[in-house]
UniProtKB/Swiss-Prot annotation:
GO biological process, one term: glutamine biosynthetic process
Family to which the UniProt record says this protein belongs: Belongs to the glutamine synthetase family.
Upper taxonomic lineage: Eukaryota, Viridiplantae, Streptophyta, Embryophyta, Tracheophyta
EC numbers for this chain: 6.3.1.2
Protein's UniProt name: Glutamine synthetase root isozyme B
Length: 357
């Protein structure tokens, strides 16, 4: 008799051409991820060839019970690292039956910005550093921390190794490999300053694909922690006190910034970001005021600043960029729970499209 693990790992391609497509979308809170699966007659590689679908929006805080149907529009396809074979993960955005985007559909406006000819011509690149915290199930306390107590002070945990410094590496490594299998442009991982906190990086990714890849990577991480009986938190300051928060630093460049003379373009872009600081902060994640205190490698939330190699500034420029006279900059303000569609498109809009009045 087959064991459960045998059935979970069963290769469908040996017996049928049919595949399983897991449709994934963002729920009513703007950070919760939902998904459900359907059978398709055969392999699909183009999201435009996937059928639209629907779900009960009243159960995700996205529609009233008397008119609960919400429509899923497939937008991006990734290989399914859990079912494998020809099975796929499908990133969707959400609409009313009349075709209007829901308020939680941040992809819709982002796609409009990225399709603007001036933005498309600049080929915007993003590298997102997604930090997160692993929590012990049921007690809302970081993995590896003594229950009701605290580990030793910060210092040995950043990029640390050893059973007394790195908690949850098996989850992190499984996630890394699963993202590579899925076709996500994940570029690295590392342990963070607070024990139980980790980071993965996605990019360089062009335009709207950065948001699609971050949401797909978050979904895969949620699934792996589900299997492991661990909870993943994207709270920007999960533990109060003298502990680092969790961010989602956004590294950004345009074609003009990557070419000779690009450093001057970067400085003009940073000036624009400073003029719209309040608007960006308002869109960069809930609870970010608990993280952006001017301590723990952050800038004060109320003060815009930038500097070369300064991790205490709002915007950091790397020394290589300064030396080469071209490159990229890092926006250190986004919280770990930010919507990547909002952050990436807003940076492009401000630096490329927005004009000072």
């Amino acid at each position: 008799m087959s064991s459960l693990s045998d059935l979970i790992n069963f290769n469908l391609s040996d017996s049928t051409e049919k595949i399983i497509a897991e449709y994934i979308w963002v729920g009513g809170s703007g950070i919760d991820i939902r998904s459900k699966a359907r059978t398709l007659p055969g392999p699909v590689s183009d999201p435009a060839k996937l059928p639209k679908w629907n779900y009960d929006g009243s159960s995700t805080d996205q529609a009233p019970g008397k008119d609960s149907e919400v429509i899923l529009y497939p937008q991006a396809i990734f290989k399914d690292p859990f079912r494998r074979g020809n099975n796929i993960l499908v990133i969707c955005d959400v609409y009313t039956p009349a075709g209007e985007p829901l308020p939680t559909n941040k992809r819709y406006n982002a796609a409009k910005i990225f399709s603007h000819p001036d933005v498309a011509a600049e080929v915007p690149w993003y590298g997102i550093e997604q930090e997160y915290t692993l929590l012990q199930k049921d007690i809302n306390w970081p993995l590896g921390w003594p229950i009701g107590g605290y580990p030793g002070k910060q210092g040995p945990y950043y990029c640390g190794i050893g059973a007394d410094k790195a908690y949850g590496r098996d989850i992190v490594d499984a996630h890394y490999k699963a993202c590579l299998f899925a076709g996500i442009n994940i570029s690295g991982i590392n342990g963070e300053v607070m024990p139980g906190q980790w980071e993965f990086q996605v990019g360089p990714s062009v335009g709207i694909s950065a948001g699609d890849e971050i949401w797909a990577a978050r979904y895969i991480l949620e699934r792996i922690t589900e299997i492991s009986g661990v909870v993943v938190s994207f709270d920007p300051k999960p533990i109060p006190g003298d502990w680092n928060g969790a961010g989602a630093h956004a590294n950004f460049s345009t074609k003009s910034m990557r070419e000779n003379g690009g450093y001057e373009v970067i400085k003009k872009a940073i000036e624009k970001l400073g003029l719209r600081h309040k608007e960006h902060i308002a869109a960069y994640g809930e609870g970010n005021e608990r993280r952006l205190t001017g301590k723990h490698e952050t800038a004060d939330i109320n003060v815009f600043s930038w500097g070369v190699a300064n991790r205490g500034s709002s915007i950091r420029v790397g020394r290589d960029t300064e030396k080469d006279g071209k490159g990229y900059f890092e926006d250190r303000r986004p919280a770990s729970n930010m919507d990547p569609y909002v952050v990436t498109s807003m940076i492009a809009e401000t630096t490329i499209l927005w004009k000072k009045s």
